[in-house]
């Protein structure tokens, strides 16, 4: 199930240890509400793998994601300074950072850093019928494209995802100074089953 976040969180391990954080049918959720806005400065995963466990009954499908920022109303704006994943193997069925619903309240993430990660999906065609972008922030209220850096990472076999960053709608705020940098990355069989985006 979901774990509601109200403070910053970091999953850290020593280099070379690489423990695994298992998530199934849920994940961490941020849900700002009037008079109850979480104070979250960072969400960090470093030297920790993130996976959905293999269990009888198949994958949890699109209900499994690392961080979900829920729909919220006007007057509940929230700013997260950084979302970082470094040195991690990620095996999830649908997405890592999910902001699927249009919101009147604004969620701003100042910096997104993905480095030295190996990212793949769970391609269980019976239970995984929807996949989203690795970062899926495509609608109104998703102000996350300010400073995105993806380096030294491999993205592979996520067949029905609409691209690594989803397909943005015209309502997504993007400033003139925004920058998205991708360097030294490999993409293989990502979104190969989508006929259009």
Q: How would you label these PLM feature ranges?
A:
Residues 68-77, 96-106:
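Extended alpha-helical scaffolding regions
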Residues 8, 40-52, 79-92, 107-127, ...:
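Right-handed parallel beta-helix
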Residues 2-12, 21-79:
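Extracellular beta-strand-rich solenoid/capping regions of secreted or surface-exposed proteins
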Residues 13-19, 48, 142, 174:
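Extracellular beta-strand-rich, repetitive "passenger/adhesive" scaffolds
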Residues 102-105, 139-141, 168-174:
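Flexible gly/pro/ser-rich segments immediately N-terminal to CXXCH heme-c attachment motifs
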Residues 50, 60-64, 72, 163, ...:
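Long hydrophobic alpha-helices with heptad-repeat/coiled-coil character
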Residues 27-29, 56, 61-68, 96-98, ...:
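Structural detector of coil-to-beta-strand junctions
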């Amino acid at each position: 199930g979901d774990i509601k976040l109200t403070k910053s969180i970091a999953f850290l391990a020593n280099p070379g240890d690489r423990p695994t954080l298992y998530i199934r049918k849920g994940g961490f959720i941020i849900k700002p509400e009037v008079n109850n806005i979480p104070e979250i400065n960072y969400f960090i995963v470093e030297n920790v793998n993130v996976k959905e466990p293999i269990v009888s009954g198949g994958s949890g499908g699109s209900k499994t994601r690392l961080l979900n920022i829920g729909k919220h109303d006007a007057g509940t704006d929230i700013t997260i300074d950084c979302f970082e994943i470094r040195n991690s193997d990620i095996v999830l069925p649908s997405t890592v950072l999910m902001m699927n619903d249009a919101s009147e309240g604004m969620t701003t993430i100042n910096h997104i850093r993905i480095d030295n990660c190996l990212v793949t999906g769970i391609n269980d065609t019976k239970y995984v019928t929807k996949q989203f972008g690795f970062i899926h922030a495509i609608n109104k209220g998703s102000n996350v494209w300010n400073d995105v850096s993806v380096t030294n990472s491999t993205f592979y076999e996520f067949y029905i995802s609409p691209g690594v960053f989803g397909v943005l709608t015209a309502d997504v705020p993007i400033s003139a100074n925004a920058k998205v940098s991708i360097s030294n990355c490999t993409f293989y069989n990502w979104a190969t089953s989508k006929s259009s985006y």
